[in-house]
Swiss-Prot record:
Lineage: Eukaryota, Metazoa, Chordata, Craniata, Vertebrata
Pfam families in alphabetical order: C1-set
Domain Ig-like C1-type span(s) in chain numbering: 6-100
Subcellular locations according to the entry: Endoplasmic reticulum; Secreted
Disulfide links within the chain: C27-C86
Gene Ontology CC terms, in alphabetical order: endoplasmic reticulum; extracellular region
Gene: Igll1
Gene3D superfamilies: Immunoglobulins
Chief location: endoplasmic reticulum
Name the record gives this protein: Immunoglobulin lambda-like polypeptide 1
Keywords of the record: Disulfide bond, Endoplasmic reticulum, Immunoglobulin domain, Secreted
InterPro entries reported for this sequence: Ig-like_dom, Ig-like_dom_sf, Ig-like_fold, Ig/MHC_CS, Ig_C1-set, MHC/Immunoglobulin
Length: 105
């Protein structure tokens, strides 16, 4: 099976989430092969490890893989003007998706 680069999508927390005490950003990584990769999170370019949870790769129906990575912050840590980044390293290649929540409101 040929190598397949990951497709990375970064989801912001919903308003419903923001009213709770926790905020979760989701980085969905799909369509990759082989099934090993590394997901890193950064806030304003600074690596973050606390509050990060990444699932084990699961096989899709097309024999490629997908993982989800979650960054959970307490509301006090949530800064709409910050830049949140999800970086995926797969087979020596890096894909990074960034979002600034202030741009979305």
């Amino acid at each position: 099976q040929p190598k397949s680069d990951p497709l990375v999508t970064l989801f912001l927390p919903s308003l419903k989430n923001l009213q709770a005490n926790k905020v979760t950003l989701v980085c969905l990584v799909s369509e990759f092969y082989p099934g090993t990769l590394v997901v890193d999170w950064k806030v304003d370019g600074v690596p973050v490890t606390q509050g990060v949870e990444t699932t084990q790769p699961s096989k899709q129906t097309n024999n490629k893989y997908m993982v989800s990575s979650y960054l959970t912050l307490i509301s006090d840590q949530w800064m709409p003007h910050s830049r949140y980044s999800c970086r995926v390293t797969h087979e020596g290649n890096t894909v990074e998706k960034s979002v600034s929540p202030a741009e979305c409101s």
